[in-house]
Every structure is written in C-alpha cells, then in structure tokens.
Amino acid sequence: MKRIVVIVLMMAACLGNAQAQLHLKANVQNNHLWRGMEVADGCLILTDLGYTFANGHMTLGLWGGTNTQGSYKEFNHYITLRTGGLEFSAMDTYNFSPGATYNNRQYFNYSAHETGRFLNCTLNYRFQQPRFPLLLSWSTIMFGRDRSADNKEQKYTTFVYAEYPIYNKEGWKVDAGVGGAFALNKAGEKQNFYGNTSGIVHTQLKVSHDLKIGSYTLPVHAMGLWNPQSQKAYFQIGAQIVNL
C-alpha cells in the first residue's frame, strides 16, 4: 500500500502542471443509496474534494459523508483515470455506523483479516455516440471486508451495471439503470457483499433537473431504487449545494 501511495504521489508531482484543477462538490440529501443498499438515512451531507491533472486524464480525491445525527461517517480516498468514454477508478472506502459488525475503529488497519475497509475497483465505459449514450460498468472489491465466513479467502464480489438516459429535454433528464452482483470466488458460499445470493440487487429510476433561482443554478434530483432480492425499496431526493 505504501508503494502505491509513493507511486501516485510521484505521478502527481510529474504531471501536476498539466492543466491541474481543484474541485469541491457537496450534496444534501435524505439518504445515501449505493448498489441496492441504504448505507445511511437522515439528512446527509456528501462531499467530494478532487485534484485533476494530466490534461484531465487523472484525478486524486477525498470523498466523505455524514448525517446530522452523527451515526454515519465515511471518509474515502480515490484515484480515477480516464480517456474518451473509458474510465477506471479505485476507491479505498472506510465508513462507520453504530450497528456495524465489521472493524470500524481502526482507520489505518490494512490487515486483510482485520480491516474494516474495502478497495473497490471500477471500470466504466460510456458509448460516445449521441444517439446511444449507454453506460456499462464492472466493479470488483479487490481487498478488505469481502471475506468468506471463515475469514480465509477474499470473495472478490463483483457488481455489473448498465444505465441509459431515457429522457433528456428542456433541462430534465431521466436515467434508468439495473445492476447485479456475484462473487468471483464463492468460497463454497452463496452470499456476496451485496446480497444472500447472485442476482439483480439494484434497479433505479433517477430524475435530474437544474433549478434556476435568479442567477443561481441548483442541480436537484429524485430517485427511486428497488432491490428485488432483499424485497426493499428506497426513495431519495437531493440537491448539489456546492460546485467549485
């Protein structure tokens, strides 16, 4: 892990002058939904601080979230590489909630058998044809709390996802998506990181709109999410309050 950090910092130093840019974004929403799960509820603030360089091809960033009750906290590190419609990202995720059954009290613990973290690697491709802007995504948990029941093997749970904008007119956009999960290494078990068995765990319909308030633009969204495997459904509404 230390070697990876050193390599990334060296790349940043070498490429940092090539059209480098800082950005800060923050959203307020009523819950945090991710891949068929409600990670946290209540009023949340989610933030993204990033440094983009190498002519826009690379971003290093910090992603964080908390709810107003203080029962949920998340602080992640990530790196993103992109070219054309292809994008690769790796996010080192660490989150805390009172009911967690994993180790969420040792931030710097990277022991495979003990850590509460997980490293999620994602490869996205967005078709560049204006008439067919389909998004395809493959994500695998490469390290961390995605283990077999006896804690001897990494399961490499994978989430595959497809999304398509079914409406995009007059400032309104509607995206429909569906995702399924399975373990590359089942380790003799049916369960994976996202559910009790392989299958569809995420279907969504998201409506986005840029709300004009005088000279200010407030991006807002509403989303319905259904998980047929867990028999659960969630509704989310949110707004982007910072975009620098």
Q: In which residue ranges do the predicted regions lie?
A:
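Outer-membrane beta-barrel initiation region
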Residues: A20-T52
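Outer-membrane beta-barrel "beta-signal"
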Residues: L205, Q231-L244
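Outer-membrane pore/translocation modules
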Residues: T68-Y161, K190-S198
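Cleavable N-terminal export/targeting peptides
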Residues: M1-H23, L244
